[in-house]
Regions:
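The N-lobe alphaC helix and its flanking beta3-alphaC-beta4 segment of protein kinase-like domains
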Residues: 12, 94-95
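A short mid-domain helix/strand-loop element embedded in enzyme catalytic domains
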Residues: 68-72, 113-114
Length: 223
């Protein structure tokens, strides 16, 4: 997994170099760090790959989100055939959230096939309704008292079989770990922090992962 992340990180520099060579201005960092955005009192956010200007087919001085992705051969071919929205809607949503938060009217989706290094690029226009929809969805999930509704009641459903969280979703009572995030006494507060109602204190990162003597599973995780 670390090697996969490293490959993606290397491709960011490659894409930046390629875009500069065709005349684009490319900024991959802000003050020496990745561009970031957040919402829902700091509990939701992400990191932008960069910001571009002078992108062909985009108004000259319009800043543009840069989104760089690596794809396996099957995924890349689906992208070529069907386009971004149909084949990788989650990537499209990610871009819309970043564009909405950073007030960018355009985005450039850049994809590389890890098998043969072929490239795909697609210009994306801002649709604030999509960004707002999924930010509101994240807010509902973050502040929810119960776990979200399952995509399917069958763990054998094809999307569930490929989900990293299938076990905890379909068998929560057997899979839930004891920590503050599974405890009914914890609740999110400002600046991405969590408080404990039982102890009336802010939960540290160290305590968050192990819980305490007052731990009580939320309703969906109780045996």
């Amino acid at each position: 997994m670390l090697r996969l992340f490293a490959r993606g990180h290397r491709e960011e520099a490659v894409f930046g170099s390629l875009l500069r060579r065709i005349g684009c201005d490319a900024w991959l960092e802000e003050d020496g760090k990745q561009y970031k955005c957040s919402d829902v009192e700091g509990h939701f956010g992400g990191s932008l790959d960069g910001v571009l200007k002078k992108v062909p087919d985009i108004p000259l001085n319009a800043p543009c989100l840069a989104e760089f992705k690596t794809h396996g051969d099957k995924s890349y071919k689906a992208l070529l055939k069907d386009g971004l929205v149909a084949s990788k809607y989650q990537h499209y949503v990610q871009m819309q959230i970043y564009m909405h938060k950073k007030n960018l009217e355009y985005g450039l989706y850049c994809a590389v096939n890890k098998n043969d290094d072929s490239l795909f690029m697609e210009i994306v226009r801002l649709d604030r309704s999509v960004g707002e929809q999924f930010i509101n969805r994240s807010r509902d999930i973050i502040y929810a008292k119960r776990t979200p509704k399952r995509l399917s009641e069958s763990p054998g459903y094809y999307k569930c079989k490929f989900c990293d969280y299938s076990d905890i979703c379909h068998f929560p009572k057997a899979q839930a770990e004891k920590n503050c995030r599974t405890c009914e006494h914890s609740f999110p507060v400002k600046d991405g922090k969590w408080d404990c109602a039982a102890k009336a204190l802010e939960i540290s990162k160290e305590l968050m992962v192990k819980g305490c003597e007052f731990h009580e599973f939320i309703e969906d995780f109780k045996g």
